[in-house]
C-alpha cells in the first residue's frame, strides 16, 4: 500500500522520477513549492546501487544543479570504498576500551578522573569515525527515488538545503556502535546514541513520501540498569527547518520516530518548523 511498485503504476518510470509535489499539498507546497530534481538533464539522472555511487551522484553539497538518484536494491552505508562491511572494530579509535568506559562511568566509580576523560575522548573519536562514513549531506534540488527494492541501510541523510524530494525508499536506521552514558538524562541516567535516518537540519521545501522507516535487528543489552540504546531517531526536523510535507510513510518498530524542534530555548525556530504530516502510519 505504501511503497509504489512501478509495474502497477499508471505512469511510467520517467514520469514518476520527475513528479513534483502538488499544489496545496502541505507546507512544502508553500512559496516556490517542492520540485526536487525534476528539472535534471539526462546527465544528472543516476542509477545508484552502492554507497560509492550514491555519494558520487550527489556530488558537492554546494552544487545546486538539479539531480535525480534512482535507487536499486539495498545500499549499506557501513561499508568502505570497496564494499567491505565495516564493524565496530573498524571505527574504534586507538585506545578505546569499553570495559574501561563502563568502569569509569559507573555510579560511585572509584576510577581515576583521567581514565574517564580519556575514554570520553576515545568514544567521541570513534563516533566521528563512524559519522564520516554514514552521514551524507544532500544538496539542493535533489530527488532520491526508490525504483526496485530500494533500501538505504545505516545512513544519516542530512537535509540542510532547499528543495529535496525522497520517495519510495525503505530506511533501516543507523546503528551507533558507540552509545554514550549521560548520568543526568532522566532520574536514573540514560544511554544516548547519535544519527537518524533523515536529519532535516535547516532544510526547506522537503517532501518525504511513500517511505518506510524502521530499525534493524539488534541485541538487547543493559548497563547500569538502562537499555544500551544503539539507535536514535528516524526523522529529526530541527535548526529552523521549514516547509516540510511527510505523506504516506510507515514508521515501524521504533520508539522515537519523529522529532520536530529540539529545544524550547531556540528562539530562531520561532515561525519556522512548519510541518505537514498526512496519511502516515505509525
Report the location of each language-model feature.
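Bacterial N-terminal signal peptides
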Residues: 1-5
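Active-site-proximal loop/turn and secondary-structure-junction residues that shape catalytic pockets
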Residues: 75, 257, 262-264
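Extracellular beta-strand-rich solenoid/capping regions of secreted or surface-exposed proteins
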Residues: 56-65, 78-143, 151-168, 173-204
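Acidic Gly/Asp/Thr-rich repetitive segments characteristic of extracellular carbohydrate-active
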Residues: 23-70
